[in-house]
Amino acid sequence: MYVVYILYSEKLNKFYTGFTSNFDLRLYFHFNSENRKFTHNASDWTLYLKMECESKNQAMLIEKHIKKMKSKIYIQNLIKYPEIIDSLCLKYKNC
């Protein structure tokens, strides 16, 4: 199973969006790895959103869609309006 996830840092007031097939391991690397690029700038990252996807391709396309929006408001609206997540899953269902 693939997961699209969004982390939030209050210190930076920034979101990080990614996807993975091993969520627990990926989160571990975000918090503990020496090779972190973006998430090393803060130590207060929290899980903001986690979406389960049907395939790797669906997860990649949803991640790309969210990043392309370049909007904190859009990401906040994913929580505020769960139907947006449903529509993304449907839009990229058979990709």
Task: Pin down the residues of each PLM region.
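GIY-YIG nuclease catalytic motif and its immediate N-terminal context
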Residues: M1-R36, H40-K50, M60-K67, L78-C95
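Short, surface-exposed polybasic/aromatic micro-patch for ligand or macromolecular engagement
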Residues: C53
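A common structural junction motif
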Residues: M69-S71
